[in-house]
Each structure stands twice: as structure tokens, then as C-alpha cells.
Amino acid sequence: GMQFTEAGLSEDLSAIYDLGWFYDLRPEFKMVPEGVQVIYHVMENPVYQKTDVEGNTVLNKQRVASFFDLEQGKIANLKDINKCVQKLEEEYRSNGYILARVTDVHMEKDGTLKVAVNEGIVEGFKVKGNVKTKDYVVTREMKLKKGEPFNAKAARRSMQRVYNLGYFEDVNIKLNPG
């Protein structure tokens, strides 16, 4: 065989993990007359059964789950799951929900894929630099609402509505993490 090195072992472990089929991997070393034999003990991902979604309001559970087009009754592949996460996040972004993220995705032993979404909820508004009118005159023009997911398209419309009031030379939105 090959000469044993820690770097080689690390490369092997990474290559096996990168296949996406295993959630745990443990090398076992066995002394043989020729040197060391490495036996890899793998723990396969569970067999996929269904997707369970939480934290979503913009897209319903069925719509979110539809992005996870995994084959029921087959072993889940983490690479496929990660591609599904990317497609879902892109769907949110293309609809203006630029702060939405999948914050957790994991497989339960029973084959349930748990997906947690944070849609980037608006926690409130602060009006700064306003001396020409009451703040509520500005905030009533906001298409964004406290407690709803932030939407860049609605934010642009809101800025335009505030600008159209005629009180301000410039209107912009600054996002501050909550």
C-alpha cells in the first residue's frame, strides 16, 4: 500500500466526508506485518422520509419543503441538502427578502430533515434627521411593518413614498442588526 502519514489520513477523512453520505467517520488503526492498516468505520446519514420547516411566513411549509427535492426512502446526501439550502435562499433573495437565511438544517434519526428559516424580521424603525414634520408622517409611508420580514423591494417603495412627501432632499435606509 501507501506510506501512512497524518496528512494523508486527514485528506482521506475529508474526501470521505465530502461525499456527503456520512455523518460520522472513525478511523481504526491495525498493526499488520507490512505496517499499519487503516479501517474506516462510517455512520451513514439516515434514510430521508420528510422535511419539517419552521420560522417561515413568506413561503408556506409546502413551498419551502419543495426546495428539498430529496428522494423519500433513500439515504440523505449532505451535498444535495446544501444545494437545496442555496436554492431556497436564492428564492427568498429574488423576491426581495435579502436578510432571509436558513439558520439550521439537520437530519433526525427518524429521517426527518429539520429546516429552520430566519426571514430577517423588522424589529422597528427610527427616523433620523427629520425636522420638517412629525415622525409618524414618515413612518406611515413605510410599506415595511414591524414584526414582518424585511423586503428590499418594499423598502425601496417606502423610501420613494417618503421622498415624494417633498420634505426631504435625500431618503435612505440603514439596517442595524437586532
Question: Locations of the language-model features?
Answer:
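Periplasmic polypeptide-binding modules associated with outer-membrane biogenesis and secretion
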Residues: 1-178
